């Protein structure tokens, strides 16, 4: 019985020590039309390099006279399907629903795009994200752009 418990304990420790844990993702960038964007999220890895990310983001449409009047916030979940795996990097396709508000008006939408991530030796990742958002129920229908970010393992 002792051997069985020790073997079970060692197996649990070995499984918990894998490098495939969750990551904190922090991104910022520019989107069209005239939008600053910042995103924070949690990425949970799946098998074969795929992942799911739960995120929240805030942004602002900069305008000449009223800079803070064009803000928005939203949140959502994105499935990331691995397209190509490199030695230290990966190209993924991102797709998922989102919801939020812009100028006190609620919206729902879809997000799609691509993400390239490069992994450093310490486990941190650099991410280059191309996003396309299509939103419904208000005037801010399309947003697309580039974001740069890092992913920090837990």
Residue map of PLM features:
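Cleavable N-terminal export/targeting peptides
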Residues: 1-23, 154
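Structural signature of outer-membrane beta-barrel channels/translocons
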Residues: 43-47, 80-84, 100-102, 115-119, ...
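Short loop/turn motifs that connect adjacent beta-strands in outer-membrane beta-barrel proteins
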Residues: 19-22, 47-49, 83-91, 104, ...
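Transmembrane beta-barrel strands of outer-membrane/channel proteins
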Residues: 26-32, 54-60, 77, 93-99, ...
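Membrane-embedded beta-strand positions in outer-membrane beta-barrel channels/transporters
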Residues: 25, 37-39, 74-78, 111-113, ...
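Solvent-exposed loop/turn segments connecting transmembrane beta-strands
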Residues: 26-39, 62-71, 99-108, 134-143
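Outer-membrane beta-barrel "beta-signal"
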Residues: 141-154
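Short glycine/proline- and aromatic-enriched beta-strand/turn motifs that initiate or cap beta-hairpins
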Residues: 19-64, 151-153
């Amino acid at each position: 019985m002792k051997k069985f418990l020790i073997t079970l304990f060692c197996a649990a420790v070995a499984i918990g020590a894998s490098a495939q844990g969750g990551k904190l993702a922090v991104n910022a960038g520019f989107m069209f039309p005239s939008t600053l964007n910042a995103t924070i999220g949690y990425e949970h890895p799946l098998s074969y390099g795929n992942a799911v990310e739960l995120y929240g983001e805030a942004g602002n449409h900069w305008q000449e006279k009223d800079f803070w009047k064009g803000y928005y916030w939203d949140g959502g979940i994105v499935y990331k399907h691995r397209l190509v795996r490199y030695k230290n990097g990966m190209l993924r396709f991102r797709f998922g629903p989102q919801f939020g508000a812009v100028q006190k008006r609620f919206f729902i939408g879809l997000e799609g795009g691509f993400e390239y991530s490069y992994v450093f030796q310490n486990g941190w990742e650099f991410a280059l994200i191309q996003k396309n958002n299509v939103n419904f129920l208000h005037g801010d229908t399309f947003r697309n752009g580039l974001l740069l970010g890092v992913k920090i393992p837990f």
